[in-house]
Design a protein with these regions (language model features):
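Helix N-cap/capping motif at the beta->alpha junctions
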Residues: 30-39, 60
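Short amphipathic alpha-helix used as the core "switch/output" element in two-component signaling
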Residues: 39, 61-74
């Protein structure tokens, strides 16, 4: 079963995506901040990560930096799913092999699901 890690501090949003992906047959696990997200990815070894940028304790850019430092985290596809516009995105993301950058307000949950399917098909 394909595994998705959702690292998002907004419980309503993460739960909405969890239900959407589980209905599509994916295994989904969630973390509410970057620190917990790094731990989750280390244990879970997901096939893809949906990552918010602005979170408490550790933001998404720092979490992804930590994930990419690990052998197991170097090649996991990552979709940034955030309210931060691309022009405001942290510069360090440019060097962290982000597959796609999605502004939450720009896409419906169905469209995000399609983006994940496309990414997994590559």
């Amino acid at each position: 079963m394909t595994k998705i890690a959702i690292i998002e501090d907004d419980a309503v949003i993460s739960q909405m995506y969890r239900m959407k992906f589980e209905a599509e047959g994916y295994e989904v696990q969630m973390a509410a901040n970057g620190r917990l997200g790094v731990e989750l990815v280390g244990k879970m070894r997901p096939d893809i990560i949906l990552l918010d940028l602005r979170m408490p304790e550790m933001d998404g850019a720092e979490a992804l930096t930590q994930i990419r430092k690990k052998d197991w985290g170097k090649n996991i596809p990552v979709l940034i799913l955030t309210n931060v516009g691309v022009e405001e995105a942290p510069k360090e993301l440019e060097n962290l092999n982000v597959l796609s950058y999605i502004v939450k307000a720009d896409l419906t949950p169905r469209q995000v699901t399609e983006k994940v399917k496309e990414a997994l098909a590559k």
